[in-house]
């Protein structure tokens, strides 16, 4: 999925911002969260997040649900590199495995399982 954030901000600017964030808040992860383009789910009001590294993927999903005011019976799926990350995984481990070369972690969300492949949970 193509990131609008990447389209709107040049690489050097994104990289410098991510580095500044990581220096100032070493226990936080810079995340860009965007809606999958053709999804019928609500658009989020804020793309940029500074996430505690010990937050789980499931807790991050909860934050996103609240931001888009998604009712409990509606489904939401989040994707990292077009794959569903395990809900119990720590955001720090997802960041280390999937961060972009600019230093941000790009997450997309959808009301449907667009890509449909789950990451294997490491035991």
Curated annotation (Swiss-Prot):
Membrane topology type: Lipid-anchor
GO MF, one annotated term: phosphatidylethanolamine binding
Residues making up the propeptide: 117-123
Site, as annotated: Cleavage: 116-117
Gene Ontology terms: cellular component: autophagosome membrane; cytoplasmic vesicle; fungal-type vacuole membrane
Domain of life: Eukaryota
Intracellular or extracellular location(s): Cytoplasmic vesicle, Autophagosome membrane; Vacuole membrane
Pfam families, per database record: ATG8
PTM notes: The C-terminal 7 residues are removed by atg4 to expose Gly-116 at the C-terminus. The c-terminal Gly is then amidated with phosphatidylethanolamine by an activating system similar to that for ubiquitin.
GO terms classed as biological process: autophagosome assembly; autophagosome maturation; cellular response to nitrogen starvation; mitophagy; protein transport
Entry keywords, A to Z: Autophagy, Cytoplasmic vesicle, Lipoprotein, Membrane, Protein transport, Transport, Ubl conjugation pathway, Vacuole
Sites of Phosphatidylethanolamine amidated glycine lipidation: 116
Family per record: Belongs to the ATG8 family.
Function: Ubiquitin-like modifier involved in autophagosome formation. With atg4, mediates the delivery of the autophagosomes to the vacuole via the microtubule cytoskeleton. Required for selective autophagic degradation of the nucleus (nucleophagy) as well as for mitophagy which contributes to regulate mitochondrial quantity and quality by eliminating the mitochondria to a basal level to fulfill cellular energy requirements and preventing excess ROS production. Participates also in membrane fusion events that take place in the early secretory pathway.
Record-given protein name: Autophagy-related protein 8
Lineage: Eukaryota, Fungi, Dikarya, Ascomycota, Pezizomycotina
Gene: atg8
């Amino acid at each position: 999925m193509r990131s609008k954030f990447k389209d709107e901000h040049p690489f050097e600017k994104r990289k410098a911002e991510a580095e500044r964030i990581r220096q100032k808040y070493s226990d936080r992860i810079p995340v860009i969260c965007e809606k999958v383009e053709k999804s019928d789910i609500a658009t989020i009001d804020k793309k940029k997040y500074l996430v505690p590294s010990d937050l789980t993927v499931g807790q991050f999903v909860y934050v996103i649900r609240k931001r888009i005011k998604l009712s409990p019976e509606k489904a939401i799926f989040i994707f990292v590199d077009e794959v569903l990350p395990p809900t119990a995984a720590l955001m720090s481990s997802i960041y280390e495995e999937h961060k972009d070369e600019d230093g941000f972690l790009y997450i997309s969300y959808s009301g449907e399982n667009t890509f449909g492949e789950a990451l294997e949970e490491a035991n």
